[in-house]
Amino acid sequence: MTTLKITPAKLNGSVCVPSSKSMGHREIICAGLSAGTSIVDNISMSDDMEATLRCLTALGIGFQKVPSERSGRTALAINGSGNVRVSQSTVDCGESGSTLRFMIPLGALCGEPLTFTGHGKLVTRPLQAYYDIFDRQGLSYTTASNGYLPLTVNGVLKSGDYELPGNVSSQFISGLLFALPLLAGDSVLKITSALESQSYVD
């Protein structure tokens, strides 16, 4: 039998902690919506992050991997143009709910048909919060049966008043926060009940 002796001691040094996937999605999207090139470092790459990058590419936003200051991490140079346009008619969101819900409002800025697809359980993830907004605005969209993917959005969101319940996923709120500032007029996003995922929105 091997005996392991542990001697108490004070720790010192530095540790590079894994980055937040939720924040990583948001950071690269914000960089893509900004004018000019932004460097986003310490990204923990995953299938979900790759899905978000695919969607950015479909919206005319370029990127390339660049050397990271942190060993084992990924850094991206995001080439934002300050707006979005459809450069691919179909985007595959993989199994990433964050990607899908963040990108739908951005796709609804383009004024051209854009189809969102996915795999696994993502196909049946609820999107009714967006469908209600589209219905109120008369924005054209089509889905498979029961509101499932694929979803094709064809129209442009209008500036104005928006409402979402506070118990809806913060992904819906973040998606609108990405898109509404890019509209020509002012908009108000009202949360109609207590916000349950405030840390992600803040």
Predicted segments, located by residue:
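Structural preference for solvent-exposed beta-strand-turn elements
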Residues: 1-202
